[in-house]
Amino acid sequence: MFGLYAGVRPVKAYPNITNRLSNKLASNIDLVILRESTEGLFYTAAVHNRCPVDNNEEVQDIMRITRKTTEKLHDFAFKLARQRKSKGKLGKVTCVDKANVFRSQALFRKIFDERKENFKDIESEHCYVDAMALNLIRNPWEYDVMVMENMFGDILSVSYTHLTLPTKA
């Protein structure tokens, strides 16, 4: 309806604030989780108004990925990485998906690979969402812009923003 397809979630460590990661490189965390905001697995909730469960035997949800929205999202990710690169950031886009399991995610990745050809000055890579959950604990400073489906972005952005918050005194 409003075309608000890109949810931009910055994750940044701030100087002189002790965060939850012990590695000294943690002070260099400055990344963006870019989540698609109108499709993905949350599409079912939007379409069906978060219906209560009325069938105790089986329920299905839809992970909707469209070419039109995904192309816009990936282009936005690469343009954001280019803008950040001009300000001294990494200038890298990571496509976070589960393409090895879901056909919808395989399409998401395929479109990413097509769109990256228009941004040859920007480094790009893939990472499965479960591996990314671990990588963001091990070495979050190695990422710049991460683009993903709505639910994955929701989970990772909430989880990893917490890592950069101050610890209790």
Residue ranges and their predicted role:
Residues L156-Y160:
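Glycine/threonine-rich flexible loop motifs
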Residues A13, K98-A99, V129, M151:
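Short, ordered loop/turn segments at secondary-structure junctions
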Residues M1-M63, M151:
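N-terminal glycine-rich phosphate/adenylate-binding segment common to multiple enzyme folds
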Residues Q105-M146, N150, D154-I155:
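Active-site rim loops that border cofactor/substrate pockets in soluble metabolic enzymes
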Residues F2, S22-S27, S86-G88, K116-N118, ...:
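Solvent-exposed alpha-helices and their adjacent loops that cap or buttress functional pockets
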